Amino acid sequence: MNTIVNRVWILCVFGLVALLGACSDNDDGLAKVDAGTAEQQSTPSAEIHKLEDGSTYQGQILDGKKNGQGVYIWPNGDRYDGEWKDGLMSGQGTFEDAQGHIYSGQWKKGEFHGRGVYRWPSGSRYEGGFVNGKKEGVGTYEWADGRSYRGEFSNDLKHGNGTYTWPDGRKYMGQFQADQRSGQGKMLYPDGEIYEGEFVDGARSGQGTRTQSDGVVYEGTFQDDMAQGQGRMEWPSGETYEGQFAEDMPHGRGQKSWPSGNQYQGEFKSSVMDGRGMLTFADGRVYDGQFKLGKRSGKGTLSWPSGEKYSGEFVDGMREGRGVFTWPDGSKYVGGFQQNALHGRGVCSMDGADTPCRFDRGVRIE
């Protein structure tokens, strides 16, 4: 589109001699093929005029200027057929350049102005409003590759409310700023995913809700198209997570609940429990300590509702290494553990007396 607009504008502003007759306020450069006295007439007369560079104008002349209907043809093959006023393209008309760009619609002082249709050689097409040679107001832009936009334009750019569709089935409905999806909007994806919320420069950024095709729902903060910051995620199974996210995954401090009744509150890394946290089981057990890759690993304390308690080392979710096990009556074992069982040498404390003891996979042998 700029090719045509620039050509016409340059002609009007600089008054190039080669195309002076197209836009100049003065038609002195026109050479009539059919001699006459049109320049002195106060009513339009249809004449054929030829410029020295080979451009021709056939149409009405009034007071020495193109006025009314006329056809102007440039030496390179560009052509305008339509209305003129005071030597400029004004009113209804069609311009086609040698490369195949075509504009048909309203003009004002040599520029697209009003309603019109612009077609590219590639097959792309725009129909809608123009102001001073640029897309403005409401219009429809259809690309040759199957994309389309229907909505508001400002200063030649998508700006305001509109609907943008892709050939693969994606669809956006919402606000645009400076040609980009920015503001509030709704995005539909071919696989059934839906996002509704804020956009910045074409990406999901700000507050929003994403419903994935598998039923997972995230509501919270987005940045650069991903869940980032504070949010809440819910799975079809009934699992929920609320807390910090990074790169679309639970990451940082958060709380997760399972349908079984288990609950975890603490640190996450890349979607799994990792770091310091507390896991409360539905049966009343409570673990408070370190986690690694989703399992109890490191130092921690496991308490039972019956009053039993273990404090010590864990490996891959099991009591492993050195630890202290306390019974409800106050009896205590301090020593080694293996796969959740008392194992190895230790000290058994009962009734206030400490006695060396030894266990083999939970069975006392000394």
Regions found by a protein language model. Give the residues of each.
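Sec-dependent N-terminal signal peptides
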Residues: 11-16
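Bacterial N-terminal signal peptides that target proteins for export
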Residues: 2-10
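Bacterial lipoprotein signal-peptidase II cleavage site
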Residues: 24-31
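Conserved anchor residues at repeat-unit boundaries in beta-strand-based tandem repeats, strongest
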Residues: 56-67, 79-90, 102-113, 125-136, ...
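C-terminal motif of bacterial Sec signal peptides marking the signal peptidase cleavage site
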Residues: 19-22
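N-terminal segments that cap or nucleate solenoid repeat domains
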Residues: 31-83, 92, 366
